[in-house]
Amino acid sequence: MSSKGDLSRCRNIGIMAHIDAGKTTTTERILFYTGKQNRIGEVHEGAASMDWMEQERERGITITSAATTCFWNDCRINIIDTPGHVDFTIEVERSLRVLDGAVAVFDGVAGVEPQSETVWRQADKYDVPRICFVNKMDRIGADFYACVDMIKDRLGAVPLVLQLPIGVDKSFVGVVDLVEMRSITWEEDSLGAKFNYGEIPSDLMEKAQDYRARLIESAVEMNDEAMNLYLDGGEISVPLLKSCIRSGVIGAKFVPVLCGSAFKNKGVQPLLDAVVDFLPSPSDIPTIEGASASDPQKAVTIKSSVDDKFVALAFKVMVDRFVGSLTFIRVYSGKLTGKSVVLNSAKGVTESVGRILRMHANNREDISEIQAGDIAALAGLKKTTTGDTLCDQNFPVVLEKMDFPESVMEIAVEPVSTADQEKMGTALSRLVAEDPSLKVCVNSESGQTILKGMGELHLEIIVDRMKREFGVEASVGAPQVAYRETITKSAEIEYVHKKQTGGAGQFAKVNILFEPLPPGSGFEFENKITCGAIPKEYIPGVQSGLELVKETGMIAGFPVIDFKATLFDGAFHEVDSSPLAFELAAKGAFREMANKAGPVLLEPIMRVEIITPDEYMGDVIGDVNSRRGRVAEMQDRHNAKLITAFIPLGKMFGYVKDLRSMSQGRAQYSMYFARYERVPENAVDNVMKK
């Protein structure tokens, strides 16, 4: 096994895909073939070890990311299995933030699906090198070559084919290894544990030679020695070819494509070989950038070294009924032992580490030490939340925080028993600590508790967890759309807050420029005060006031997004000014701005993909139009049509029932949040009435 200090023999990878592409099934085979577990857990039987939550086993889907560690070819592989459903995309986001590489699993029949695109873009965001595994090659309709084309066309990637399938559908028996130019077939009675190398079938030899020539031509561009040898007509050895492929993967020049059928126990061992051979180790990504905790403008370079100061990022928090709060971290440099004290530089507090745990889904193994490249869980931390940096107290550095998506749906919840009100508050506070995409607030008018999340399934799971894990049964209101507001024009506001009450009064003057920002920008605050017009101790009051008041809206009480507020001038009074006075002045400036900056209402727009038999296409498109939807694309999908449309979320309630009705149950759909758009003038009144 790899030595603890050898970073080159470590891989931190994620398994990512669209729902039902076979991520967890692939992970279960990996754990079986690496000897991590002695039996294969099947998703459809509710026995997958990585799907440990009751809801996951009942529904056959992954809801929360699960971590484990296994060994292959003297290499330690830390694996995070992520969800494929769009409602739990936050789990993919925070996992990719701390991983060095990823395996993207595709359904060999469906190819690149909507959530495949979403997770691919998330991996692009964090520059995560990846390899592709075209799964389910045993299924009727599986088309490896069409899937490769979709990886190129829909993902904008450069696929580098390393394998070809031997056989199609039920006759799929193995793969052609283009690197070694041999066949690999699996013995079914061994559950795929035994496999054989052999000659390439004669009917595939010409195609294999063609694809290998393409492989070599692309790969040698990564290495001058290999390129010169290739141009001189020399033979490219297998070790040199692998080295070229590895360089190209780490440099994001291309993505290797392999194939198999995890459920039929074919193709997983070569996938593991590819993880070790081609995906980067922590030492291949030698430095990361952070900022000084005392001076955020000062960049700090952190080396991926066991010998440097300890730096780690907390990427997940979960509550374990036996251990309490567990904080999952990725260590970027240095070492950490149990019973240590570390600095949470994001919050400016120290934390005492109780136990260090290596996780296998929800099973725990105590370990004495972790070091650069490790992923583990810490017990005993009290104040650390997702995205916080943990570091040596003598090296206060802050890593880039994580961005979390806006919620698109909300529900009102009340405990069935009034005696459970306090228990519900405790339950929700713990669930929010675990899930940064879940927001909880109280409606100031009705007093109702409002849950805001990523979709109906997300919120349904939260309510179910309250009941199962905390014993709180809640009555739930109908789902509501999470509308937003924004501004369309710039406005410069001068506002004076002045109040005299006999004793010390209140005085604050602010000059703020409000400007619209591009969609998805959120809220930005900039301080441009010079010459002490407003003392620096009052500036946080201005920002706090704007942060609070923007949540109350301008038109219909919905949060305001995608705007910038620049504080450029103001005035204060030596006696009557205070942070509170400036907070109130900022709120007043915001309310005055609402009349001048062209406020508009925004609604979440969903990307909806509908697969329907040809004979129902007209009805389906007509229905899309009736929902204020826009058809963006239509494609042939075997004997059906794939319709891609953009439809307001508010028009999608009850759609599953309507689609079944108009297609006699033969059509299906999936939807994903795309963006916020302005509500048309003729629809604003209907939204306001809600």
From Swiss-Prot:
SUPFAM superfamilies: EF-G C-terminal domain-like (SSF54980), P-loop containing nucleoside triphosphate hydrolases (SSF52540), Ribosomal protein S5 domain 2-like (SSF54211), Translation proteins (SSF50447). One of its GO terms (molecular function) is translation elongation factor activity. Belongs to the TRAFAC class translation factor GTPase superfamily. Classic translation factor GTPase family. EF-G/EF-2 subfamily. It is found in: Cytoplasm. GTP binds at residues 17-24, 81-85, 135-138. Keywords: Cytoplasm, Elongation factor, GTP-binding, Nucleotide-binding, Protein biosynthesis. Residues 8-283 form the tr-type G domain. It comes from Anaplasma marginale (strain St. Maries). Catalyzes the GTP-dependent ribosomal translocation step during translation elongation. During this step, the ribosome changes from the pre-translocational (PRE) to the post-translocational (POST) state as the newly formed A-site-bound peptidyl-tRNA and P-site-bound deacylated tRNA move to the P and E sites, respectively. Catalyzes the coordinated movement of the two tRNA molecules, the mRNA and conformational changes in the ribosome. InterPro entries: EF-G-like_DII, EFG_II, EFG_III, EFG_III/V, EFG_IV, EFG_V, EFG_V-like, G_TR_CS. One of its GO terms (biological process) is ribosome disassembly. NCBIfam families: EF-G, PRK12740.1-5, small_GTP. This is Elongation factor G. One of its GO terms (cellular component) is cytoplasm.
